[in-house]
């Protein structure tokens, strides 16, 4: 793939995602959930996310993490008074308690934990529009995860969750981009990067 601007790539990937039929997305979400048993997470902390729109994943995936014995933390996204994204805060996932939030997201109710709490996670599932084989991740562009992931433990598995066709050969990267260690796709499962 020849490098394109991040903006052009985001637009193309979002258009492609929106064209995927709901039944296909549901099947892919179920496949993603099936790969979780390969993670050794009982008694450990997993930072995950609540998918919105056409993002890969599901609430059932979060429930499976709990069933596997993990402490599951979900992000809380906020901007400062000037509209600049702040590092993500974290809230404990409890089934049936998610509330509507800014940016069309769903999140756990307070109390919330500080951004540095991500450092307790052994596994971090990160939403992405795409990831490449070197671990470069393309998000939606707000920078919430880039402002937060530098708090992750060096030993954490940082896993971008994408559709199979969103694992690319190359993505334009910038110095502030935090590399993923793994990718999770419906067909490939969990694959080490870099």
Curated annotation (Swiss-Prot):
Involved in the removal of 5-formyltetrahydrofolate. In vitro, it is a potent inhibitor of various folate-dependent enzymes in the C1 metabolism network and in vivo it might function as a folate storage. 5-formyltetrahydrofolate is also used as an antifolate rescue agent in cancer chemotherapy. Catalyzes the irreversible ATP-dependent transformation of 5-formyltetrahydrofolate (5-CHO-THF) to form 5,10-methenyltetrahydrofolate (5,10-CH=THF). The reverse reaction is catalyzed by the serine hydroxymethyltransferase GlyA (SHMT). ATP binds at residues 6-10, 139-146, 177. This is 5-formyltetrahydrofolate cyclo-ligase. It comes from Mycolicibacterium smegmatis (strain ATCC 700084 / mc(2)155) (Mycobacterium smegmatis). It catalyses: (6S)-5-formyl-5,6,7,8-tetrahydrofolate + ATP = (6R)-5,10-methenyltetrahydrofolate + ADP + phosphate. Keywords: ATP-binding, Ligase, Nucleotide-binding. The keyword RNA-binding does not apply. Its EC number is 6.3.3.2. It comes from the Bacteria. One of its GO terms (biological process) is tetrahydrofolate interconversion. One of its GO terms (molecular function) is ATP binding. Pathway: One-carbon metabolism; tetrahydrofolate interconversion. PANTHER family: 5-FORMYLTETRAHYDROFOLATE CYCLO-LIGASE (PTHR23407:SF1), ATPASE INHIBITOR/5-FORMYLTETRAHYDROFOLATE CYCLO-LIGASE (PTHR23407). Belongs to the 5-formyltetrahydrofolate cyclo-ligase family. Disruption phenotype: Cells lacking this gene lead to an accumulation of 5-CHO-THF. This mutant becomes more susceptible to antifolates that inhibit folate biosynthesis (sulfonamides) or reduction (trimethoprim). The keyword Electron transport does not apply.
């Amino acid at each position: 793939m020849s490098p394109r601007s991040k903006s052009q790539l985001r637009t193309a990937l979002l258009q492609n995602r929106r064209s995927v039929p709901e039944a296909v997305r549901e099947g892919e979400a179920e496949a993603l959930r099936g790969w979780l048993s390969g993670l050794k997470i009982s008694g450990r902390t997993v930072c995950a996310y609540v998918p919105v729109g056409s993002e890969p994943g599901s609430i059932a995936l979060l429930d499976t993490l709990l069933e596997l014995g993990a402490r599951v933390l979900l992000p809380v996204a906020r901007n400062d008074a000037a509209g600049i994204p702040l590092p993500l805060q974290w809230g404990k996932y409890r089934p049936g308690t998610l509330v509507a939030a800014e940016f069309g997201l769903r999140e756990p109710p307070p109390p919330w934990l500080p951004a540095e709490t991500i450092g307790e996670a052994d596994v971090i599932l990160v939403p992405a529009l795409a990831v490449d084989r070197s671990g470069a991740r393309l998000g939606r562009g707000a920078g919430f995860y880039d402002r937060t992931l530098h708090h992750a433990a060096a030993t954490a598995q940082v896993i971008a969750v994408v559709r199979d066709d969103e694992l690319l050969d190359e993505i334009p990267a910038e110095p502030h981009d935090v590399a993923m260690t793994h990718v999770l796709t419906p067909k490939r499962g969990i694959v080490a990067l870099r």
